Amino acid sequence: MTHTTLFTSESVSEGHPDKVADQISDAVLDALISQDPNCRVACEAVVKSGMVFVAGEITTNAWADVEQITRNTVLQIGYNDPHLGFDGETCAVVTAIGKQSPDIVMGVDGREDQELGAGDQGLMFGYASRETDVFMPAPITYAHRLVRQQALLRKNGRLPWLRPDAKSQVTLRYENGKPVAADCIVLSTQHSPEISQESLREAVIDEIIKPIMPPHWLDKHTRFLVNPTGRFVIGGPVGDCGLTGRKIIVDTYGGMARHGGGCFSGKDPSKVDRSGAYAARYVAKNIVAGGLADRCEIQVSYAIGVAEPTSISVETFGTGKIDEVRTQQLIKEHFDLRPGKIIEELNLLRSIYKATATYGHFGREEPEFTWERTDKAEILREAAGLAAANVTN
């Protein structure tokens, strides 16, 4: 008997106000970590109308022009015209930055790298599945690709009436756990006032949605909701206040997997909210790529100042090819999840973070995304005593 379900995920463009804030936070981190790999950064941003407020705790020997970094980031996104209500050239930039608490420093720094203590307590999740070629859930994968296509057509001038702010939402129909069709696709994009809604709808469907979505998923039952309110001229930080760390489900698995609650952007890799989540994805992806399971969710947890995880757990949703206890043993044998070793293994002391702040931290194929490697898949497969797996990444 066929079991049919629907699942929905959303994404937002680089011009969405929350993503503007994320990119500013990670641009500041990149500028500092490129000079001082051992910097300690917790950088938050708030954007609204003509103002950006950058605050946080930073301890470093490096120097960064936070105001200019902020302006450059806003301009690169596309907010470069006063008529948009938010312009990187003219917006006010206010900063309030202190140093990391010495109580935290005492528990984190001053040790051998492999014994680097976790920068805070917390729990993180990593997930992978065989739904897509990047081992990610299909709804979030295609939601990201839609808003990325919107940005591409805006920047290359093909659809010159597009503006930076946009959102996508993809609802897929699943049969027996596998995606088979698109039930509903929502694309809301900011636009200049002169474009008619009829022309906008036609262009969005033909130029953004259809080139991205698999054609066999689109049928007469698929609903296309393009700018459902009928108008989206006012957008970006004029329409809504943006805040770092407010799109954590967009950043991860679109709701298909659990989330520990900590955001990523603006945090150096001593913060396990970020490095622990990247490592958990690395573990889960290698387990699935190695054929040990078709779906895998990893949870890891830490205590502040302690290097060893307080727990590691695995869930394969009934798709595991070996016992989960054995899978957990293999994780402990082949992955060192102490923060210092994660940083070393994944080469995280680099200025790679601004690129992660848009279109998801996972399922990316750029070489900077080292946690997407499947270099341990074959090792795990052999250790589990399984036949050769089809590893595509």
UniProtKB/Swiss-Prot annotation:
Chain residues that bind ATP: 16, 165-167, 231-232, 240, 246-247, 267
Keywords for this protein: ATP-binding, Cytoplasm, Magnesium, Metal-binding, Nucleotide-binding, One-carbon metabolism, Potassium, Transferase
Reaction catalyzed: L-methionine + ATP + H2O = S-adenosyl-L-methionine + phosphate + diphosphate
CDD domains: S-AdoMet_synt (cd18079)
Record's cofactor remark: Binds 2 divalent ions per subunit.
Name of protein: S-adenosylmethionine synthase
GO terms for biological process, alphabetical: one-carbon metabolic process; S-adenosylmethionine biosynthetic process
Function: Catalyzes the formation of S-adenosylmethionine (AdoMet) from methionine and ATP. The overall synthetic reaction is composed of two sequential steps, AdoMet formation and the subsequent tripolyphosphate hydrolysis which occurs prior to release of AdoMet from the enzyme.
UniProt record similarity statement: Belongs to the AdoMet synthase family.
Localization in the cell: Cytoplasm
EC annotation from Swiss-Prot or TrEMBL: 2.5.1.6
